């Protein structure tokens, strides 16, 4: 079978997973070309487009027109915006909507939104009829560079974030960089935390490039597409090595152990903290904790903080509005982290910028003492 032809102005990043490999297409105008791109790959399918109220208002009409032009029948399923939609209740609502539309296993669920919509929709696609086709159309910077790639899906519980879900790969990812122009500055900054993360994991050259070019990434120049594509390449390489997070893939959680604890502590209240902001603080804390453990030089931790501060991201616990619970309570949330194995704490720590590693059996007393110190740091 011949590979589908792709417009010249679109960057393609392959995700190599054997017979479950797929492409990430990155460029402007992909919302208007979505019907054409999907019809090339999944002939004769009907789709449920899962989106949130904000994205629906801004972009759904264009997307449904694109599908109609390609002869693709669409059932829109609209959920409330925000982290609170990553719940069992919303999962049931969306599942019932897909079943009510009589969509079959060979049809597709299309996630048209940010990370919440993508995680929720992928879970639905993975469990309805034991697995439907799945297409990611991420509309936030965070979802374009991170959550839409690699097949992680799921919902939150009262015990913590992303504790229930499945690995379920999409057949296609369409990342329209034009829709990022409609994001609020705060949403864009939050997504940028995940971009910076790739440099901090194992690409010091990329982090240095971001330090020099972040303003053009924010303003929407060619550097934006370059940053998104490079981030996707970084993630695709890790996912190809370790799809189900039994080893290296855990590196992608740099900043997330602390960050998820902060999200849980703030009740997933987006007026106080959104995911990318939690990750930004978490990455700064991971570097500071690495300094405390004599793994990393103070100058690298300060460089990370300086960059986060320059782009307008929070980097201290005191940056979380409304205060935080005591260190002991934060430790309770950390103990629920997915990377905990046989009760031992696992963190992604670093020996310097671009030198992150998986640290197992991290002493809880050291983490507790560190959190107490940072809670007192203004």
UniProtKB/Swiss-Prot annotation:
Q: Which reaction does it catalyse?
A: 7-phospho-2-dehydro-3-deoxy-D-arabino-heptonate = 3-dehydroquinate + phosphate
Q: Which cofactor does it need?
A: Co(2+); Zn(2+); NAD(+)
Give the pathway listed in the UniProt entry for this protein: Metabolic intermediate biosynthesis; chorismate biosynthesis; chorismate from D-erythrose 4-phosphate and phosphoenolpyruvate: step 2/7
GO molecular function (one): 3-dehydroquinate synthase activity
KW DNA-binding (keyword) present? no
Sites binding NAD(+) sit at 115-119, 139-140, 152, 161
Record note on cofactor: Binds 1 divalent metal cation per subunit. Can use either Co(2+) or Zn(2+).
Q: Which GO terms describe its cellular component?
A: cytoplasm
Q: Which UniProt keywords apply?
A: Amino-acid biosynthesis, Aromatic amino acid biosynthesis, Cobalt, Cytoplasm, Lyase, Metal-binding, NAD, Nucleotide-binding, Zinc
Tell me where in or outside the cell this protein is found.
Cytoplasm
Main location, first listed in the record: cytoplasm
Broad class of enzyme this protein falls into: lyase
Quote the EC number.
4.2.3.4
On the tree of life, the source organism's domain of life is Bacteria
What this chain does, per the record? Catalyzes the conversion of 3-deoxy-D-arabino-heptulosonate 7-phosphate (DAHP) to dehydroquinate (DHQ).
The cross-references to PANTHER family, in alphabetical order and at most eight, read: 3-DEHYDROQUINATE SYNTHASE (PTHR43622), 3-DEHYDROQUINATE SYNTHASE, CHLOROPLASTIC (PTHR43622:SF7)
What protein name does the entry list?
3-dehydroquinate synthase
Which species is the source of this protein?
Brucella anthropi (strain ATCC 49188 / DSM 6882 / CCUG 24695 / JCM 21032 / LMG 3331 / NBRC 15819 / NCTC 12168 / Alc 37) (Ochrobactrum anthropi)
* Gene (name only): aroB
